[in-house]
Amino acid sequence: MLLTLFHRIAEPESARIRLRVVELGLKPRIDFLNAETDGKDELARLGGSLTPALWDGRMLIVGEPAIGRILAALPADREDGR
């Protein structure tokens, strides 16, 4: 399943979530879309405006704490096999 992370470059919460995605080896499973540029219309279509926000194909999860819990529960997809 491919997830979509809507983020803002200058937003500290978004930056921490992007870093966490990479640290957990989840980047191959999560597409990053900037909510101020390429992801703006899609985020609005999904009924969102706040970031960070994670779309799982059914639901928009909003906020650093909630997204952090989701990320922690996902299995890693790391190139190094760890």
What is each stretch, according to the model?
Residues 1-33:
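Local sequence-structure signature of Cys/Sec-based thiol-disulfide redox active-site neighborhoods
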Residues 10, 35-36, 59-60:
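Short beta->alpha junction loops/turns
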Residues 55-82:
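Non-catalytic, surface beta->alpha helical segment in thiol-disulfide oxidoreductase systems
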Residues 13, 17, 39, 63-70:
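Amphipathic alpha-helical interface surfaces
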Residues 31-49, 77:
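Thioredoxin-like thiol-disulfide oxidoreductase module
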